[in-house]
Amino acid sequence: MAERGLEPSPAAVAALPPEVRAQLAELELELSEGDITQKGYEKKRSKLLSPYSPQTQETDSAVQKELRNQTPAPSAAQTSAPSKYHRTRSGGARDERYRSDIHTEAVQAALAKHKEQKMALPMPTKRRSTFVQSPADACTPPDTSSASEDEGSLRRQAALSAALQQSLQNAESWINRSIQGSSTSSSASSTLSHGEVKGTSGSLADVFANTRIENFSAPPDVTTTTSSSSSSSSIRPANIDLPPSGIVKGMHKGSNRSSLMDTADGVPVSSRVSTKIQQLLNTLKRPKRPPLKEFFVDDSEEIVEVPQPDPNQPKPEGRQMTPVKGEPLGVICNWPPALESALQRWGTTQAKCSCLTALDMTGKPVYTLTYGKLWSRSLKLAYTLLNKLGTKNEPVLKPGDRVALVYPNNDPVMFMVAFYGCLLAEVIPVPIEVPLTRKDAGGQQIGFLLGSCGIALALTSEVCLKGLPKTQNGEIVQFKGWPRLKWVVTDSKYLSKPPKDWQPHISPAGTEPAYIEYKTSKEGSVMGVTVSRLAMLSHCQALSQACNYSEGETIVNVLDFKKDAGLWHGMFANVMNKMHTISVPYSVMKTCPLSWVQRVHAHKAKVALVKCRDLHWAMMAHRDQRDVSLSSLRMLIVTDGANPWSVSSCDAFLSLFQSHGLKPEAICPCATSAEAMTVAIRRPGVPGAPLPGRAILSMNGLSYGVIRVNTEDKNSALTVQDVGHVMPGGMMCIVKPDGPPQLCKTDEIGEICVSSRTGGMMYFGLAGVTKNTFEVIPVNSAGSPVGDVPFIRSGLLGFVGPGSLVFVVGKMDGLLMVSGRRHNADDIVATGLAVESIKTVYRGRIAVFSVSVFYDERIVVVAEQRPDASEEDSFQWMSRVLQAIDSIHQVGVYCLALVPANTLPKTPLGGIHISQTKQLFLEGSLHPCNILMCPHTCVTNLPKPRQKQPGVGPASVMVGNLVAGKRIAQAAGRDLGQIEENDLVRKHQFLAEILQWRAQATPDHVLFMLLNAKGTTVCTASCLQLHKRAERIASVLGDKGHLNAGDNVVLLYPPGIELIAAFYGCLYAGCIPVTVRPPHAQNLTATLPTVRMIVDVSKAACILTSQTLMRLLRSREAAAAVDVKTWPTIIDTDDLPRKRLPQLYKPPTPEMLAYLDFSVSTTGMLTGVKMSHSAVNALCRAIKLQCELYSSRQIAICLDPYCGLGFALWCLCSVYSGHQSVLIPPMELENNLFLWLSTVNQYKIRDTFCSYSVMELCTKGLGNQVEVLKTRGINLSCVRTCVVVAEERPRVALQQSFSKLFKDIGLSPRAVSTTFGSRVNVAICLQGTSGPDPTTVYVDLKSLRHDRVRLVERGAPQSLLLSESGKILPGVKVVIVNPETKGPVGDSHLGEIWVNSPHTASGYYTIYDSETLQADHFNTRLSFGDAAQTLWARTGYLGFVRRTELTAATGERHDALYVVGALDETLELRGLRYHPIDIETSVSRIHRSIAECAVFTWTNLLVVVVELCGSEQEALDLVPLVTNVVLEEHYLIVGVVVVVDPGVIPINSRGEKQRMHLRDSFLADQLDPIYVAYNM
């Protein structure tokens, strides 16, 4: 790899003055810590070296020449453009709020462009669907994901010249080169922080990579489709697919990246260099860990790829706007001083005049409230509220208190009386919706409002009270989140008549609160907008002037009379002007959509208050009634004129009803908001005057917040109508929607702000939010305030056009800010509905919102699917919607979900409760029936795939390393030679001899006890019994089996003592035992082939088993799974003849083979290793010393006895050490969960061993049974060590849950620990009885993906808790090695764990002669730095060693070994290394219904399989949650999400997931998934 031009040699570095060397070293350190950039480093470094550069160049010309020979191969990351969606679709019905024929044409035109191209996307597969396709053949997704760069292209290859190879032959050159190949680091952060440093040794590794690794047979390739042929960086050879039954040997690939050589006091390098090291170490200080706060800095700048702004994006060019004033508010002499005064006036002088008419369900008038009745009943209510609810001394209500008004939408009369009654009593009404159920959508937030307003009293009608949900004993239910309320019925018969002398107190309107109107924010929180009496009055005056209201006019109100324009016009302005309101409830509109038009016709109404929805419904029902006239209407107030899509409804209504007398100038759109009240309204026009113009705006311009008349593609235009002028007496300005309230330019979209006496005054009880909304002082571009008049934010987006006309283009609440561009949710809904949806979705039942995922907002569209829509129709419609939104808005949709009809949460008036829908989506409770995720097209800010950076030069790396004061990462258990032992066992070299000796010395000493599910002893074995049983088995092997010494014998037994006897029987006969898990009788097809495979691979001459299993092996069911005719000799050992061998076999040397240990790894590889007699002896001795085992001890074992340490503990250790083993077969726990713990308690066991499966079973199964355990008298205080036997990274969370759960029954939190072993050495670590407790560290996951270790503090984001895997066993040494260069790395650096120990296996057992592989794995040497030339075995696991402050048993500082994960399990994605367990842990956390999760890769796509333990309707809820969490926490896009039934993910006896088996089943379409989602 080409390095920097001026690369001084070690000699040149040594020649530099000490202070320059020190500064250089500091600089290297800063670079490795990430404190400075590569560029800054280069600059400072060249400045430092410039005075010495001539010498440097002369001394190192050889290096220069060498560098010129090493030109790196170009590495182009091939990313194909994200695929657009191509498939023709047909579509359906629309919601007329969003209807626009122009827009529909635009959408159809946009879709037409896609017509020719086919969609390159597989349909999701759903169980019980007629459209299930095989994932393997029909569903190969396009290889176009941003996460699927071709991995070969991300790797660099270094060419090496022949001359260089020659020069590397002598040792001196090795040392110098390897020192140059080292790299900088600190104690807490490891070397590769700026990419990989590859010195010449690394290059050499490249050259020999093929001979070392690639030629050997390997497991089926799982992650790559291409592989760089000459680079060791390709972990797995490509395109080698072995048949499932193929014989596979253990093999650990060279890892792709790891930190490189770090030298210090651990391994001698060269004395000449070490003096220099000593000098530097003495002069330079050790680096410190970064301060705590640094771990919590949001590092999105480093992570996120910020999309470059489009150079052609439109920018505002106008001048800064000036606030626009409305006409002055006219002063009319007879206007009342307060609204209550107007009521008093009309109620006493015009008592017979009609005030309000209510309709029945058929739309006929049912009751008319006169002004006299309104006045008298309001008066009675006011008097009752103040005087009759409590005692005289303790009234329940005082003026200024808040009360809730709970009246249905079809009872305007009762509501009006209650509202004015409150005003007269000077209590503050808070109108809310009638709760329908205990848990209404958004009901909890209404409860929050009631609580924050301090409301204890609710007014309602008798009818409404009867309809409220009740408990069984007739009380009103306690609504979720609500305070306790007292309900008061306001029907006349319950009210007291005030005495003659009682009069309400009506003062002139001031700033005291009059009423509170609730408002739901975008997030779903409900706030109370407080309106003062003065604002209420002023607003009525402004409306009266703007609408030119006069006494006696009739107004038809179709809106909700409890809030917004329905309240202001229909309840306030009518009283102010003595008008007559006819209230048409929503329920009547549903049954008789034309009722409001009929009311206008019948009453010759002058004004109608409607929404676009009402216009649309009237048009739909128009044919039912032809003889209506709307000629009396002077104003048709369209109150949702602020919706940009209202223009088409208005146009359509006018064209239909103009023939019925509707005047074009009568249509008056207006814009309102809860905070600013009426923002603008179009005044009633003069007949014959030209109608206001339209604005045809570019959607692209709008997305950048700029007003541009649309000239480009007419498909992406938005036509908006004005909403008239500013209100009388008001002033309006437009400010930027985000940041400080800076005035916009004239061609810029912003938030409309209004200043007048007619707006709200505050959010009740929320001072902080109030200031930002109700007290806004606009500033100019320099940031200085413009005037001192406070404005109110209206929450509407728009601009002031020519002639001071106000245009609204959307709401702040509907704003979706995606990748720096603004989109309006309503616009997206309109586009979705313009895609003809025929039978797919319901109009008006679409929700659009954004969710924040990976540092940006992502658009989610949710719609209700019609029950009769087919899967195919739905999928077609969804695909077309994606195309349409992409074409028209140039934005991708992250997720499109269809839910069953009527399942979206509704608002009280029947709309969709958006925030609640979003909440359900995020918590996984939406239950979609169809879903499409498109993360590949939307997520454009992923970090660039990692590419190897040019490394820091070898010499400077060397210096930097010395600065860090690093020691080599190595650790060792106690030295076996120093341990004094006077044990008689030591004189025996073979385990069989020890058993014979014990049978003579202590014949009756019980070694084994086997328990059943009830906890009773079913079998015991004393030394003599075991010896005799073994003799008889040995005899049978000779007689029946005709076996010779050295023949392999498969032992097929359930966990028990028979298995142990058979093992020693084989040793006595000189045969080689191979323990195999028996097949599962109920699942032969899955379990028998593994047995067959081990029998074949081990070339077994005979199978020892029980009668039951023998019958099973030869059964018809077995014949369906394997060839039963070719089994070797099968001997059942149930009834043995009483015969013994004349002479027991004694192996000639301890190096002879004792037994074979076969195991299937998590990657699906079957590996057999050879264990010699000396290794067996050494293993047992190490365990005996570590656990202090001797004859009087008793241990309990609850794990599988077929391989690894589990086998050794079950079968070997008791015979060696003489302790008693209580054997608990794990499968018995399924029948009795208490078995293991009750056994430990019963026998007062101090040391117990189990597997993760057992621990998980107890944690999950006994989680809520701790009290039962206590009552049974189970106490675990006797337990000193509870050891989990594992070959993986410790599962800290499970261990902690177990400890926490059972601490209540005495389990010491210090007791639980784990072991660590691998195929090459089954027992490397085991906690044991002495030495410090296992330590834990938090490491940074991001660094781990780069093969670095960075220690962080607890709670740091992206941190991973790692626990030490027990203590290293006596006689065991480990070193951490860079798997590529085979050079040792420094303390706290990540690398492969290599082990040296007398009990290491002697090699793989294989039918091929792979001597080289054996050498590479079992007898390999460090490439440099080890004068002793120790032989090491490669474990295939990544980990690191860290020296702690604790003291080991030897008295020295303790070195902790941390296991990170198996190399061959890791996934290489986007140039980074991922451990599947980390992704799985994230996924398992997201939803309560996920039982288990496993991940693997398929054609460069990440596949996530989740087991669903809930109901099947939750299956699709998991798809977005899985996609979100993997994106957020791991920066990866999930390609396929597969939802399966519990138990589908195969797990082996050690509790490890068999991901490769799962992958094979997935590709063979054998999973029977509930749902398969292919993310686009």
Swiss-Prot record:
<dbReference type="GO" id="GO:0043014">
    <property type="term" value="F:alpha-tubulin binding"/>
</dbReference>
<feature type="modified residue" description="Phosphothreonine">
    <location>
        <position position="140"/>
    </location>
</feature>
<feature type="domain" description="DMAP1-binding">
    <location>
        <begin position="12"/>
        <end position="131"/>
    </location>
</feature>
<dbReference type="InterPro" id="IPR037337">
    <property type="entry name" value="Dip2-like_dom"/>
</dbReference>
<feature type="region of interest" description="Disordered">
    <location>
        <begin position="217"/>
        <end position="246"/>
    </location>
</feature>
<dbReference type="GO" id="GO:0030517">
    <property type="term" value="P:negative regulation of axon extension"/>
</dbReference>
<feature type="compositionally biased region" description="Basic and acidic residues">
    <location>
        <begin position="92"/>
        <end position="104"/>
    </location>
</feature>
<feature type="modified residue" description="Phosphoserine">
    <location>
        <position position="100"/>
    </location>
</feature>
<feature type="compositionally biased region" description="Low complexity">
    <location>
        <begin position="182"/>
        <end position="193"/>
    </location>
</feature>
<feature type="compositionally biased region" description="Low complexity">
    <location>
        <begin position="155"/>
        <end position="167"/>
    </location>
</feature>
<feature type="modified residue" description="Phosphoserine">
    <location>
        <position position="9"/>
    </location>
</feature>
<dbReference type="InterPro" id="IPR000873">
    <property type="entry name" value="AMP-dep_synth/lig_dom"/>
</dbReference>
<feature type="compositionally biased region" description="Polar residues">
    <location>
        <begin position="52"/>
        <end position="62"/>
    </location>
</feature>
<protein>
    <recommendedName>
        <fullName>Disco-interacting protein 2 homolog B</fullName>
    </recommendedName>
</protein>
<dbReference type="Pfam" id="PF23024">
    <property type="entry name" value="AMP-dom_DIP2-like"/>
</dbReference>
<feature type="modified residue" description="Phosphoserine">
    <location>
        <position position="259"/>
    </location>
</feature>
<dbReference type="GO" id="GO:2000758">
    <property type="term" value="P:positive regulation of peptidyl-lysine acetylation"/>
</dbReference>
<comment type="similarity">
    <text>Belongs to the DIP2 family.</text>
</comment>
<keyword id="KW-0524">Neurogenesis</keyword>
<feature type="modified residue" description="Phosphoserine">
    <location>
        <position position="146"/>
    </location>
</feature>
<dbReference type="InterPro" id="IPR025110">
    <property type="entry name" value="AMP-bd_C"/>
</dbReference>
<feature type="modified residue" description="Phosphoserine">
    <location>
        <position position="203"/>
    </location>
</feature>
<feature type="region of interest" description="Disordered">
    <location>
        <begin position="179"/>
        <end position="201"/>
    </location>
</feature>
<dbReference type="GO" id="GO:0007399">
    <property type="term" value="P:nervous system development"/>
</dbReference>
<dbReference type="GO" id="GO:0030425">
    <property type="term" value="C:dendrite"/>
</dbReference>
<feature type="compositionally biased region" description="Low complexity">
    <location>
        <begin position="70"/>
        <end position="83"/>
    </location>
</feature>
<dbReference type="InterPro" id="IPR010506">
    <property type="entry name" value="DMAP1-bd"/>
</dbReference>
<dbReference type="Pfam" id="PF00501">
    <property type="entry name" value="AMP-binding"/>
</dbReference>
<dbReference type="GO" id="GO:0005634">
    <property type="term" value="C:nucleus"/>
</dbReference>
<dbReference type="GO" id="GO:0005737">
    <property type="term" value="C:cytoplasm"/>
</dbReference>
<feature type="modified residue" description="Phosphoserine">
    <location>
        <position position="50"/>
    </location>
</feature>
<comment type="subunit">
    <text>Interacts with alpha-tubulin.</text>
</comment>
<dbReference type="GO" id="GO:0043204">
    <property type="term" value="C:perikaryon"/>
</dbReference>
<dbReference type="InterPro" id="IPR042099">
    <property type="entry name" value="ANL_N_sf"/>
</dbReference>
<dbReference type="GO" id="GO:0016020">
    <property type="term" value="C:membrane"/>
</dbReference>
<feature type="modified residue" description="Phosphoserine">
    <location>
        <position position="53"/>
    </location>
</feature>
<feature type="modified residue" description="Phosphoserine">
    <location>
        <position position="153"/>
    </location>
</feature>
<dbReference type="GO" id="GO:0030424">
    <property type="term" value="C:axon"/>
</dbReference>
<feature type="region of interest" description="Disordered">
    <location>
        <begin position="31"/>
        <end position="167"/>
    </location>
</feature>
<comment type="function">
    <text>Negatively regulates axonal outgrowth and is essential for normal synaptic transmission. Not required for regulation of axon polarity. Promotes acetylation of alpha-tubulin.</text>
</comment>
<keyword id="KW-0597">Phosphoprotein</keyword>
<feature type="modified residue" description="Phosphoserine">
    <location>
        <position position="193"/>
    </location>
</feature>
